[in-house]
Amino acid sequence: MGASLGQQIRCPFSRRKFKKPILRSKKIKETYPKKIKDLVLRSRKEREAGRRPAYKYALIGAESIYYELRELGISPLPPARTIHSWLKQAGSIRERKGKIRKPPNPTYPVLSCKTVNVIHELDLKGPFYLKGSSQKYYLVVLRDVYGKKAALKVLTEKEMEPLIDFLVESWQNMGRPKCLQMDNGLEFRGSNRYPRSLGKLSRVCLDLGVEPVFIPTREPWRNGVIENLNGLIQRLFLKAQTFETEKHLRRETKNLETSINTTHRLPALDGKTPQEFSARVRIRSVSPDYDWRTRNLRLLKGKVSFIRLVRKSGRITLTAKDKFFIGKKYKWQYVLAVVDVLQKQLNIYLYNKLIKSFAYK
């Protein structure tokens, strides 16, 4: 590490002391035509207003404006940090107070995801209502963790079968993943009455070669990619407009999905849209003729995984009141509990090492 300003350093060949010279680089102030800065500020205002069709569901950050200028061929092209500075000077950006975050638990099993359609995250938002109506509506959201492509649909009931129909339809269009990650809602997992009996959604996943993965209970932030998208949907969609009819709601949901996939240029995708990024990727598609209602979903093989925190007692709760003693020495550590459906066995992993096994019938 370099010495700090004025730090005394001993020469190895002498007892003399000297001060390490400090090299200063001259900062070159970048200047851009006023019309470019005005274009940036106007783009921000129009994106926030969302009145123009092209900006209705647009992102408003400095990176998004940078990619827009790049697409327009603006020269000289200011970097995103300069655009951010201009927006801050104009009062368009409010400083957020940083939240004190706890250091991540090193035992949490992070699933490897280095290409498109390895992990999809699934979530359900709602209920919400139309103006003057008591009918409940839900928004089901699916997103690819790596490629950021999304699928959205409005549901009128919080039930498993419409969710399965949505998944099959989505995977026919965007390809099926290796893993589907979701929370522990009954609409995803199944009944508490028979905790070791797989729900229909998990059975359809296994039938299609997709491994269901359930995140820890009461830790929705573990589905980070979709939670980020949910915040965007709340701001751009649910809070920004009032829906008069169900037809209007469904139409705008489709428009939002299209906008996310075809206009949102993301730094994580090197400035590409999700559609552009995944266009040349070979996908595992689901046959257009696939009908889960006519399939035999009893004779299955595959794995269902649960990420669980070992409590002080040394136990984990897999589903409902189905508890397993792992050992007190593992308290406050996360384990990956994997059900081998064919072998009817539950295997517990910590740091990818098998530490316990249980019969699971």
Q: Where do the model's predicted regions map?
A:
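Acidic/histidine-rich, metal-coordinating catalytic segments
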Residues: 158, 171-194, 216-218, 223, ...
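Basic, flexible linker segments flanking DNA-binding modules
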Residues: 14-122, 127, 199, 276-282
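Charged alpha-helix within mobile-element recombinases
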Residues: 194, 201-291
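Mobile-element integrase/transposase regions
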Residues: 76, 81, 88-143, 149-150, ...
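A structural microfeature
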Residues: 151-152, 356
